[in-house]
Amino acid sequence: MSAPRDIPELDAASLEHLEAIARRAGEAILAHYRADQPAELKADRSPITAADRAAHTVITEALAAWTPEVPVVSEEGALPDAQVRQAWRRFWLVDPLDGTKEFIQRNGEFTVNIALISDGEPVLGVVFAPALDLLYLAGRGLGAWKRQSRGPAQRLLSHPLPPGTPLVVAESRSHPSAELEQYLTTVPVKSRVRAGSSLKFCWIAEGKADIYPRFGRTMEWDVAAGDCVFRESGDGRPRTSPLRYNTPGLDNTGFIIGGPASDD
């Protein structure tokens, strides 16, 4: 176990530690996944399961032990007031189980998302799909990496897309929208692929898809870790993302990730 730190270093050791935390949370999730336990509804009518709560406990306790002076914001925890958060330069942003609908549907497309936010941008991030044993990891200046079934990590390197290239579009499995359909009439589309959770960001990073347009509201913990993987997949320089973090509502109104414009 790494010694407690006030601020995690942006180094390989921190990536390894972050991976270990995500895998521990994944183990907690899979214990409930195999038990096929029922879901409940939160006040906002979104689903929550015992797996969400178990992963939240694993992650928040591990982060508090590792970086005790860095605040943690988790979807399943108490949310600090915006005025309090505006004084933070760095904080952890966590979705313990992103894709609860996918968890309930038992299609494997749910993830553990953990990101370190520094001055409004994600600088460390891990996305782990425990049912698929698939992990994506990134850090500022450290690149983006993919690891399948605890095999060797593979570096993810993107290349700019020439204008007019027919695009493979990543889209949400659970959130179709008329706005998306309208947008897709304005760009050349080669094919469309669907997935749950933050895997869509990772697909852009590894070149499995070219663009991920999302319309409608999302929360920052839904996207931060995947956004970090996307940003650090650039070939020699970070990729440009429209997303910023620690906004007053901790939310986004829509975004387009990838495509030729992301590499300008």
What spans do the regions from the language model cover?
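Oxyanion/phosphate-interacting regions
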Residues: 1-20, 181-186, 201-264
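N-terminal subdomain of lithium-sensitive/metallo-dependent phosphomonoesterases centered on the IMPase/IPPase/PAP
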Residues: 1-97, 178, 182-185, 261-262
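Residue-level signal for inorganic ion chemistry
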Residues: 29, 52, 63, 100, ...
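Conserved beta-strand segments of alpha/beta enzyme cores
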Residues: 38, 71, 168, 188-191, ...
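Conserved beta-strand termini and adjacent loop/short-helix elements that scaffold enzyme active sites
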Residues: 42, 75, 172, 194-195, ...
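Acidic active-site catalytic centers that drive phospho-/nucleotidyl reactions
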Residues: 52, 75-76, 95-98, 200, ...
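Glycine-rich active-site/cofactor-binding loop and its immediate structural neighborhood
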Residues: 88-130
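Acidic beta-strand-loop-alpha-helix segment within the catalytic core
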Residues: 114-202, 251-264
